[in-house]
């Protein structure tokens, strides 16, 4: 019988029992594909990350899976939590990188920035520049999230599919009241996702009462088994790129996005648009540790 250590973290927060929950399993070698699926399903969180250090690549490697047997390739809470864990445990994950800081995910190099904040590592992850790759009629999305087309009117902005690592749907919502009353219709959103070629649906409003935040958001992605996610870095990056293209935010400036309020797991995602990509940043805290028996 093989024993693996695992950790549970709360991600995009500096408080336990807030943020987005993540299970991280330390492996010293690749597992069988079915084992990744089984372990992710056993934990039951939106994502489980599997981490190891590769001397061949001089890199910390991360793979992430959902309970519905999907592998996640984007730099979101799945990667942030894994890197924060390594830093909190003081694992030497950057040896051999000649002063650079990066990790491997799906065989792609993800550049990182690391500072300390409130006694915790504060990690930035670089995504690709945002690209608008499509649009979806408002009525289709309104039906899928239990709102009206009037609820989806904000500054005349379009509903666009925006991609950095992953193509998510950016859905402007009129105000906080409309955002709060959204109700997911899984089957309709799955149909729209398949027809128009987007992954998740990111509802956001800039019309809210919390002045410290750029936007308040909700994320639905039933196609990969996520009903509502408390924090979604792979969607926050595209949102920052979308708003910068509209001239609503500036390049080089830091902004904060609030997500997870309506599932009682408030999360804070910092975003910054640069010339060569988009930075997503945040903290994580370890909540528990255990052993997994294979």
Feature map (PLM): residue ranges:
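Active-site proximal loop and beta-alpha junction motif in alpha/beta enzyme cores
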Residues: 1-75, 80-294
